[in-house]
Amino acid sequence: MKRALLAALCLLLASPVLAAPPLPADPRAAKAVQDYLSQQQAQDSKDRDERVAARLDALENGPTVIANPQGTITIVEFFDYTCPYCKAAEPRLMRLVDSDKRIKLAMREFPILTRASMIASRAALASVKQGKYRAFHLALMRREGVLDEAGIFESARAVGLDVNRLRRDMAAPDISDEIVNNFNLARGIRVFQTPAYIVGGHLVTGDSADINFAKEVAKAKK
C-alpha cells in the first residue's frame, strides 16, 4: 500500500497539470533588483573609502616605501611574495612609478598564503635595517619558481645582505609589530586577499591584470 501511494505521489508531482507555469518576466522587478544592487555597490564603495580615509596616514607611511617618498600621489600595495597575481603586476607598477616621480609607492607586507610568505616578509622587513629593502623586495618578487626558505636567503645574498645579521634581525619584536600592524590595517579596510591597492586614497581590488594603474592615478589627480 505504501509503495502504491508513493508511486502515485511521484506521478502527481511529475504531472504537467500540477507543474507550476513559468513566471512571466516583470521588468519592474528586474529594475528593482538592479537598482538595489547599484545602491549597495555605491554604499559599499563609500564605506570602503571612509575606512581608508580614517587610516590613510598610517597606510601611506612606513618603513617600506620603495619609490618616490616625496611623491604627491601614493599607491599602497598589500601583497604576498608567493602571490602570482602580485608578481605578475609588479613590472607594470614599477615602470609607472619609476617613470613618474610624483607617484609614491608604499608596500604593505601581508603574508597570508604560505609559511614561506611569512619567512620572506620577516626577511624583507629585516632588510630595512641594512638599507636593502627595495633591492631585496624586487629580487623576491622577480624570483622564478616556488619560493622557499633556501631561495629567500639566496636572494638576500645576491643583493648584498649580511644573511647572519638578517636572520638575527628577523627575530626582533619590531618585525612582528610591523606585520601585526599591517594585518590590523588590512582588517580595518576590509582587505582579505592579495593583491589589493590603494591609489590616491581609493581602494582598488580585483584581477590585477585588469587594473590600469596609470588610469587609477589619473583619476586620483582629479
Model-derived features: where do they sit?
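Generic alpha-helix initiation/capping and coil-helix boundary signal
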Residues: M1, A7-A8, A116, A120, ...
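C-terminal cap of thioredoxin/glutaredoxin-like
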Residues: K2-A4, A20-K31, E154-K222
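Bacterial N-terminal signal peptides
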Residues: A7-P16
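Extracytoplasmic thiol/disulfide redox context detector
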Residues: P16-I112, A171, D177-R187, K222
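Structural alpha/beta surface segment adjacent to cysteine/selenocysteine redox centers
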Residues: V76, Y81-T82, K87-R157, R187-F192, ...
